[in-house]
């Protein structure tokens, strides 16, 4: 039972260490007193603009996605065998 419990804890630790994601939630924009929907995201890695529902990879191994709720980037890992 002790070994099973240790394996469960190890698997949770491994799962949480595999992903490193960051997100940026855009500030609301106003135009004529009305909220303007988000049209683009600005990549904080290279300062380029990307359209909503687009995906791209950065030079420092992040896979990014621009969504209506903001920009989200996750670190890509290369498995060494």
From Swiss-Prot:
Gene Ontology terms: cellular component: extracellular region
Ranked from the top, the taxonomy reads:
Eukaryota, Metazoa, Chordata, Craniata, Vertebrata
Q: Which family does it belong to?
A: Belongs to the beta-microseminoprotein family.
Biological role stated in the UniProt entry: Shows an slight inhibitory effect toward the metalloproteinase brevilysin H6, but does not inhibit the metalloproteinases thermolysin, HR1A and HR1B.
Per UniProt, the keywords (alphabetical) are: Disulfide bond, Secreted, Signal
Q: Which Pfam families match?
A: PSP94
Q: What is this protein called?
A: Small serum protein 4
**Where is this chain's protein located in or outside the cell?**
Secreted
Domain of life assignment: Eukaryota
Task: Tell me the leader sequence span.
Answer: 1-19
According to the UniProt record, which cysteines are disulfide-bonded? 21-74, 41-66, 64-73
Q: What InterPro entries does this protein map onto?
A: PSP94
Asked if the record carries the keyword Disulfide bond, the reply is yes
């Amino acid at each position: 039972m002790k070994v099973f419990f240790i394996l469960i804890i190890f698997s949770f630790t491994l799962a949480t260490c595999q992903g490193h994601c960051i997100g940026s939630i855009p500030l609301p924009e106003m135009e004529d007193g009305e909220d303007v929907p988000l049209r683009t995201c600005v990549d904080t890695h290279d300062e380029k603009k990307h359209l909503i529902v687009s995906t791209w990879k950065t030079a420092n191994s992040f896979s990014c996605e621009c969504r209506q709720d903001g920009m989200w980037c996750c670190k890509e890992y290369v498995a060494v065998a």
